[in-house]
Amino acid sequence: MDAKPWNHTSEAFQASILEDLKIIQKAGAERNAKSSHGSINSRSASPNKATSRRNRAQNGNSNGRASVDNSDDGSKDDLDYSPSVKRKHVNGEGAEKGDHDTSNNGPSITKLRRKVRRTYDTKDGFVAWNTLDDDFRPIVPDQERSRKINPQKGNNNNLLKENKSLKTTAKDLSDISSSSMKKANNSSKPLFSGKLTFKANIPVPTSEVVTENNVTRNVTVYSNQKHLGNESENFNDMEGRAEDISSNELLPTPEEYPYRYNNDYCSACHGPGNFLCCETCPNSFHFTCIDPPIEEKNLPDDAWYCNECKHHSLYNELDEQEELESNVKEEGTMVDVWMQLCTYIDSHNPIQFHLPHSISSFFRGVGSGVMGEYIETDVLKHLKSSRRSNGEERDPLLLKSKSGTPILCFRCHKSALVSQSILACDYCNSYWHPDCLNPPLATLPSNLRKWKCPNHSDHVTPRYRLPEKAKVIRVGLPRGFKNKGNIVIDENEDEPSVQTIQLQGKIRVVPSKPFKLNFLEQIRDNVINLRKMVEQDEQLCIETFSKFDFYATRDCELPLRILCDVANDNLENDDYVLALRDLLRISKWDPNQPVPAPFDLANLLSY
């Protein structure tokens, strides 16, 4: 039995200890009297020394037992209340069998303690002190188990006084949850009086009693009820009520956490600026992107909700929406169409029109900007920012290149010292003065876009759009393909090939040999046409080609511009002069030699 301080014990326990002390003192007095009486008998009866030790022990035990039963109670003043003399209750049946008493010694204290333990366990109507509560009432084994698990502080324990079980019923849990919900609803008022289904609500746990295999346990069920109280107080209440649930089940999932911030971009146009934020979802809108628009000076004083949240508040359940649509379909087809359109407008937030990604990114080098405008991505310039240039790579006052050669204008062959500015082409190595261009540039072009000089003919020739993800087809029979201008030469392959791009979004890879044959075929056709021209009007050809005698004395190639001027002098012979121009370009004409006569030129190029 556990030791317990004397001032912390009950009065009944102290009375039992005092009674034990009284009995022990009486037993000690009887022992002293017995020892003195035995010495007198031994002196008077000397011939009886042969008495056995066993009979002597039995006589001593019987005399001691009789002395204990026939003794009178002593006064309380003779008792000693010190803790050193506290002893257990002594049974009056005497010593056990086999025990013996030595001379001048009574029953030992250890034997008395053993007898006390046996008598406390077997004596009827006696209750041990550790089986009583603080109010001296018997404890049920279930209560004792619950007392060890959940010890209560203080002496006022109503559950132990009434001997009730600690198992909470479903009715008690429902009363607790209803009272806490009333307290939370009275503490704060909702901002919106409609039927909004708040996404930011924290699920309120409700406990239910489930019985499995005669074992009752509490289970927490999360519901979608609106919770308007303080979050920290609500979570503390839930942890206090749900005792049999682990801490992981009390915490909400990441999907159930409330929205802390709204979007930092407009949900309609995806642009930055000042927004009007919804109270139940993370959507944000410009004041002009809302339907209907709102002026910045006339903002709503109350909470504002977007169209989707308002629609969900009116039609919270899907059955109501389906029933409404079924009623509309019965009225007529036209009404059904308009009703669906109006319902779609009211239930969705406005979105700015923009081309689908499949259309805006179909062609190579074409894209859309932040606001949906058309831009050419291949013209944009990717700048490498640095501390010295601050993102500007174009220097209009360059005098020398990286290799040390002087930078001169392509047209006037002068440096930047003359006009104080010069432009570098982003597609070739030529430089131009802004005043030498036709028309002249008043300001320098932007650093974010590439600039192309007039030496390139892209601004004159028709521009073809190349598909970004075109289907590549290997042509099995390359015959029949002709040069139509939309050709890309692939120089990376081992065998030279030509890719022809058509508008159907397909790339046909053709060897270069058919195009060479087509080019030679065009030359033969031009030679035949030249012979026919000479046969029909020989004098006209002589007058036309006589104008080339001026260039025969000069050490320079025949410029194409002058050939075009010659063709413009006689509009009737444009076709023949252009054919002659093509022949002059492909012929092995030496600039040091005079221009051949038309007949010699025809014979030279004939096969």
UniProtKB/Swiss-Prot annotation:
Bias type Low complexity, positions: 177-188
Region (Disordered): 28-114, 142-188
Biological process according to GO: regulation of transcription by RNA polymerase II; transcription initiation-coupled chromatin remodeling
ZnF segments: PHD-type: 263-312, 406-459
UniProt keyword list: Metal-binding, Repeat, Zinc, Zinc-finger
UniProt key word Signal: no
Domain of life the protein comes from: Eukaryota
Name listed for the protein in its UniProt record: Uncharacterized protein C2F7.07c
Organism from which the protein derives: Schizosaccharomyces pombe (strain 972 / ATCC 24843)
Annotated CDD domains: PHD1_Rco1, PHD2_PHF12_Rco1
Keyword Cytoplasm: no
Stretches with biased composition (Basic and acidic residues): 90-102, 161-174
Any GO molecular function: molecular adaptor activity
GO cellular component, one term: nucleus
Family matches, as InterPro entries: Chromatin_regulatory_protein, Zinc_finger_PHD-type_CS, Znf_FYVE_PHD, Znf_PHD, Znf_PHD-finger, Znf_RING/FYVE/PHD
Compositional bias segments (type: Polar residues): 35-50
